[in-house]
C-alpha cells in the first residue's frame, strides 16, 4: 500500500522497455510531465502534486520489480493510474485513462499505413518468425496474402471486440488467444451421414449437388465439403464413421478392391492439394471404426440420400476393403515418396479389436513407416466408441457430457467442436508466484506460495472465460447474419433443437509450460514425483473451475493439452524479454539471442528426458487422463520400426496396459528428390553420387511436416529431443 504522506523515494529502476521493444533510460521527469498535463485539464493539482505522484510510482516500481527486471511503458502507466486513484485524484485518473486511450488510437492510426507496407517486406524477406508460425503453410503469394489478412483480423479481435484487460493479457503473454487471424470457430466435426442424406447443397446462389449414389461421387462431395467449409473454420475439420458410412456404396457400385483403392487414392491426393487460404492443405481428420459401431449395426444404410433395406452391420467385407485400400495408399506416399499429411486417420482400438485381421497389415506398415495414424484407446480409457469422437489433432470430445446437458448427440451425429481456445501461460505463473522452493530442488512449497499460484491462475482463467464468452456471442451474431452460410445450413438441426447453432461447441481452455512452471516455482519437473503431484492438482483445480463456468454460462467448457506450435515460442519470447532470469525448456537462456527459448507443450515431459517409451508412458498417464478437451502422447522415434508386426504389438501393449486416451508412433524420416523415402534423419542423401539436400520430416505437434518449415522455437525443440528407442 502506498502511504499518502510518503516523501521522495530513491529510484533503483534505471531502464524501461518502450512499445517498440527498445530498452532506454528511465526518466521520472517524463511521468511528472504526463501527470501535469492531466492536472491541467482537471485542475486537481500542480507541479508539486505531479512530482508527488511520480515519486509514488517510482516507489511501487522498486517494490514490484526486482533488480535486473525491466518494466514496460504500459506497466508504468498502469501504476500512474493506480497512484492517482490512491491519492484521491479521481478526475485526473479518468482524464489520464482517456489520454492513454486517445494516444493509443493515434499511434495505431499513424502506424497503420506504415504497417501495411512493412508487412509485405517482413514476409518477402522472412523477417517475422510468424511467417513460419504454421508449418502447414508454405512461403508463397497465397502465404503473403494470408499473412496480411491475418494481421487485420487479429487487430479486429483485439481492438474492436475484446476488452482492454483481455487484449493486454494476450499482448503481454499471460495467455494466448488462438486463431486471432480468423474470424471463425476453432474446429468442427461434421456429420458425414447428413452429407450423404442431403448432398452438398444449402446455399442460395451456389451450386447444389444431389445426394451421392456412387462411392466416387460421395468422396468427391466430401472433398468439396472439406475445401468449402475450411473457409468457415479456423482449424481442423472431421468426419467420423468414414468406413462404416461409405461401405454400402462399394457393394451398390459392385466395385473390386482395385477400384476401391483407386477411389481412396483420388480422395487422399485431392485432400492434400494446397487449396486453403495461405497455400495450405485443409486440416482434415477422419475416424475409422474398423467394425460397425454397436449403435449403427441395425441402422438402415443411406445411398442416394434414401434409407435402404440393408443395415450397416451387413457391410463388414466392404469396410475391410475400404480400410485396406486407404491404408495402402497412405503407406505408399505420393509420387516422390512424401507422406500424406492429411487426412489424419484415427483408429478406434476397442476390446473386441481383431489384432490378427490381415486387412489391417497396411495400417501397421503405414504406422511403422510414416507414423500417420492416431490411436483412440477404448480399452482402458474412460471413452466409449459410441459416444466419443475424434475431432482433430488435439480435441477430444466426450458426448456423454453433452447428453447430460440436453445436447442429444450420439455417435452418428457428431456436430460439435470448439468455438475457440485460450492457452494459459503456466510457466509465467510459476515464475511470478512467491515460493520458498525456487532454486532449492526438493523443498516443500509453502501455503502462501501455493495460494499465490492459484490466485494468479484464477485471475487468468477468468479472463480466458470472458474472452471465450465474448467470441461465442460474436460468432453467433455473425452466423445469424450469414457470414458462415454452409455451416449455418449443416448446423440447422442443432439450431432447431437448441436455439443456437453453436450450442454443441465447447469453449476450450488449454495450458502450456507446466514443466517450466514447476522448474521456476518449486525446482521440480513433470518427470519428478512431486512435480507430477502438483501438476495433477493444478489440472483438477482447473477442471473444477470449468464446471463452475458451465454452470454460470450454460455453455460447454473443456480442458485441453494445447499443441502449442506457435504458442510455445511466442510466450517464451515475451517472457525472456520481461524476465531474463526465467528458466525455459532449454534452461536459462537469458538475453542470448543466439538461443531460441521455448516452452514444453502442455504437461508433457521435458523433450530430452528419456529414450524409454514406457517410462514416458508411466510418467504421463496420470496427467494425460485429466484432460477433458483433448490430449495425445506422441512416441517420437529416430527412425521407423523395421517390422510392422512389432508396431502392431506395441500399439496393442499400450492400449491394453495404459489408460491414455490417444497416442501416436512418430518416426523421423527423410525424402530425397531422387531416391524418395529414407529411414531416419538425413540432411544430405547418402545414396546420391551428386550431393542432394533432403527434406527431413517429423511430427511438429499433431501433424507431420518438413522440419525446415518449422518456426525457430519448434526447430530448437526438435534439436533437443531425445527420441524413443523401440527394440
Where are the predicted features?
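A conserved active-site cap/scaffold subdomain adjacent to cofactor or substrate pockets
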Residues: 457, 510-513
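Conserved catalytic cores of very large enzyme subunits
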Residues: 102-106, 112-503, 524, 528-679, ...
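Metallocofactor- and cofactor-centric catalytic cores in central/energy metabolism, strongly enriched
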Residues: 39, 260, 264, 520, ...
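Long, highly charged low-complexity segments enriched in Glu/Asp and Lys/Arg with interspersed Ser/Thr
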Residues: 90-103, 658-662, 666-668, 712-727
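Charged, amphipathic alpha-helical regulatory modules used
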Residues: 2-119, 123, 722
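Long, charge-rich boundary regions
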Residues: 670-673, 690-727
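Well-ordered alpha-helical scaffold segments within catalytic/enzyme domains
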Residues: 515-524
